[in-house]
Amino acid sequence: ASWSRGLGDVYKRQVHDLAYADLCFDGYKAPSILEVDGAKDIAVEFFTLSKSYNMPGWRIGFCCGNAELIGALARLKSYFDYGHFTPVQVAGIEALNNGDEYVEEICNMYKSRRDTLCDGLNSMGWEVEKPKATMFVWAKIPERFNMKSLEFSKILLEEANVAVSPGIGFGEYGDDFIRFSLIENDQRTKQALKLSLIHISEPTRPRS
């Protein structure tokens, strides 16, 4: 991949968060940084069971990659605890060994929510590309609203009772976007789209 070229020349140490690796749609497979030539010399990759297996709060996952970095992490962790609660470890092992059908079910659920949201926004005149992975949808604010992300997010919350994340919270280049989380079922998503259409169908605020 083009993004991987010269990885070792740019970063001497790299930590890759692969939390959403299993939440992929339409045949897409999320890449691992460890696929990149030379990455195992400088990188480690973290995976959590929180997203793929609906185990948030269990604090269970694993790290793989550069042996020296993992050794340092293991030493550091040993200063804080002596291992995870055994039943949680057993549950994690069971999920990894026998949880493929459950992961597929989770993916299908998020795909349905993604399609409902993106199709709804596009029918309202937005131009939203369906993401190939994760439980989030980034949508560019249509120019007709003449607003940046924070102001638009406030209006959605105050006038339509719909909560989104303003893109500016992720950096200056996100200020023309808002981020939706696919945490509600299809019916609630349709309700949110209807409320948004009713309350902000026309531009009402000047761009800041």
Give the residues covered by each predicted segment:
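Conserved glycine-rich beta-strand-loop-beta hairpin in the small C-terminal domain of fold type I
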Residues: I93, M109-C118, V128-I141, G174
